[in-house]
């Protein structure tokens, strides 16, 4: 996804990808939803690391929550808990007004 140009263009595409993941999730195709959310999560993380903006961190928090929910449905409780812990850590940073990750 690095070849998509601007960070904003990548972010917009990732939000669309998350929306597709949500549709697949609602249909009960947990494995495909996990693949979609996992791909989006990796790139959201890259964007948050490079931009460090509150918006990029919020997107990462949403992505972590989406992935954690699907992973839990697939039975990997340990990974889901780890993803939620990371989500909560980043959310706390956002709540404190800091953009450090």
What do the predicted segments below correspond to?
Residues 1-10, 45-57, 93-99:
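Flexible helix-coil transition and linker loops at the boundaries of alpha-helical arrays
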Residues 8-26, 55-72:
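Conserved alpha-helical positions within TPR/SEL1-like repeat arrays
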């Amino acid at each position: 996804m690095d070849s998509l140009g601007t960070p904003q263009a990548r972010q917009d595409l990732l939000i669309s990808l998350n929306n597709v993941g949500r549709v697949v999730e609602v249909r009960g195709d947990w494995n495909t939803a996990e693949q979609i959310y996992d791909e989006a999560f990796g790139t959201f993380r890259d964007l948050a690391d490079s931009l460090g903006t509150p918006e990029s961190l919020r997107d990462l928090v949403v992505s972590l929550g989406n992935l954690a929910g699907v992973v839990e449905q697939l039975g990997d409780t340990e990974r889901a808990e780890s993803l939620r812990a990371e989500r909560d850590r980043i959310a706390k940073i956002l709540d404190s007004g800091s953009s450090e990750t």
